[in-house]
Amino acid sequence: MASNGADRDPEIDRLLEAKARELTKKMKYSGVVELSKENFDDFLKTFRVAVVDFWATWCAPCFMLEPIIKRLALEMPDVGFGRLNTEEEPEIAAKYYVMSLPTVIIFKDGEPVDQVVGVVPKKILQDRIKAYLED
Amino acid sequence: MYPVLLGINGMGYGDFTECYLEVLPRLMNMVERGVLENRRPQYPDKSWWSILNMEPDPTPTGDPSSTLLVKLTKATLVNIPVVNPTYGAYSIRLDATTPYDDEVNGVVNTIIKSAGKSPVIASITAPDRFLHSNGSIKCSVYRAIDNAIGQLLNSGLSSFIIFSPYGEPISPGEGEHEDYGIYIATISRPRHYDTVKLYEVGILFRDLTESVQSSGP
């Protein structure tokens, strides 16, 4: 039997609304998000675990890593995946001490917890990310 | 062997790992590597005129052998897609009639024959001819090219620029490719923190040829 509005628990409504807001925000950041100073902090806040690929147009290995990041984004929907062009946003790269490219930084609750420098096989990157989803 | 400029139309770095290539990734770690930038729309003829004329916005000339780069380097041209059929010592139609492995083998054998006598400027068009409409064969095409480059290196090639005038096809549309292609060479790129521009490839090949000829082939 369908319930009418009077039967609804306001606490459940509040939780559902919060969940809907969270999902809407995550949908905004689906796939691999192009990051900039405008959306970087909001992106990190949206996901418990987020992965940022720091790259540049002149960096050949960065282009080798790009499809690996794209595939991981499809396979790990609970994780946020973003790319930051270090030429366009040098301040953000400097803030996280990115000295070599490509560098992938894994963030948990908005804080950097791990980083991988250079091109690595998908499995290695996936395992490193999974470790932060489990604890 | 004299220096070789080998352009592979429509190849990108993106699937080097996915396709389990062996030669090109190892080569990247041994010589200069970079990224070639050429913005959409990219067409084979316009791109190659830019290289041969060493100009960003070239005026196509009727005879590829009379272009500035060919005059300066005295290079043999092989399968250059400025006209259809392609121009040079090996030539094919720019459609699907020549299988990718036939083209790759034909170009490589012609390079090996020619590079003992003069510098060579050559092109492989297979990724551009096939991958706009059939992405599923990408790894087969890439592996054929990877093997062929191994064959070139085994034949004694030691001075080269291997590049793509533009990246992978991204749609069935002819001029639609990734803006970034490969650059793997025995000559340093002009600026470390920048991409290599298309017209600079001709200038770099002239410099490479001059430096090799001044010290003997």
Enumerate the predicted regions with their spans.
Chain A
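Proteins that catalyze or organize thiol-disulfide redox chemistry
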Residues: 1-51, 57-63, 67-80, 90-91, ...
